[in-house]
């Protein structure tokens, strides 16, 4: 009698396992067919692609658009105040920003109040306390620019040529020497 019960439970378990795996397979196929439709709405961020335009408020309250820099090369850094590698790279970026003849503009973007970042009210005081200067900071308060540039890790830096095309994408901080060399090769 025990053998019949064990056999019945085994058959039932096998049946349930097969039924569940077919449901997952169907669900997986549905996701695969709907995924390209979702991806079609997201502009691909890659070297050679047009850099997505944005309009953000600077730390000093001015409206800044990337398109305002058309015809100029742009160093665009996405970072956060809580990010160790970001903070470690800031002194070198300040050196670069202090150079008047560098041949490109520097913009940095944070997302105040999102994902642990300081708020718009807290950030300027913290920035000053760190001794940071000469680095324009733009506020992406809704995270739309981070999303448009598909930022998944910080720091992430983009070197944009004078035609508004992405020339280099750097995950992690780029050295001043590498940034200057990359900009020198553009155009």
Language-model segments: residues:
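Short active-site neighborhood of thiol/selenol oxidoreductases, capturing the structured segment around
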Residues: 64-87, 106-107
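Loop/turn elements at helix/coil->beta-strand transitions in domains of secreted/extracellular proteins
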Residues: 71-74, 102-105, 133-135, 162-165
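Short, internal strand/loop/helix patches
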Residues: 122-160
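Conserved helix-turn-beta segment immediately C-terminal to the redox Cys motif
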Residues: 72-73, 88-111, 128, 176, ...
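A short beta-strand-turn-helix
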Residues: 45-48, 53-74, 98
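Thiol-/selenol-based redox modules, centered on thioredoxin-like
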Residues: 37, 159-187
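Thiol-based oxidoreductase modules, predominantly thioredoxin-like and allied folds used
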Residues: 104-118, 134-142
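N-terminal targeting signals for export/organelle localization
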Residues: 1-51, 187
């Amino acid at each position: 009698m025990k053998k019949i019960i064990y056999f019945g439970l085994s058959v039932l378990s096998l049946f349930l396992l097969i039924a569940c795996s077919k449901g997952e397979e169907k669900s997986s196929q549905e996701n695969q067919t709907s995924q390209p439709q979702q991806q079609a709405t997201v502009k691909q961020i890659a070297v050679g692609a047009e850099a997505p335009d944005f309009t953000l408020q600077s730390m000093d309250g001015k409206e800044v658009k990337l398109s305002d820099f058309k015809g100029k090369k742009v160093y665009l850094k996405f970072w956060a105040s809580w990010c160790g590698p970001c903070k470690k790279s800031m002194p070198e970026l300040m050196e670069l920003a202090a150079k008047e003849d560098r041949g490109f503009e520097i913009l940095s973007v944070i997302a105040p109040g999102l994902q642990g970042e300081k708020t718009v009210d807290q950030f300027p005081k913290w920035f000053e306390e760190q001794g940071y200067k000469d680095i324009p900071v733009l506020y992406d308060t809704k995270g739309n620019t981070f999303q448009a540039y598909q930022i998944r890790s910080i720091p992430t830096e983009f070197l944009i040529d004078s035609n508004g095309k992405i020339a280099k994408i750097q995950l992690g901080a780029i050295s001043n020497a590498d940034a200057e060399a990359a900009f020198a090769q553009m155009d």
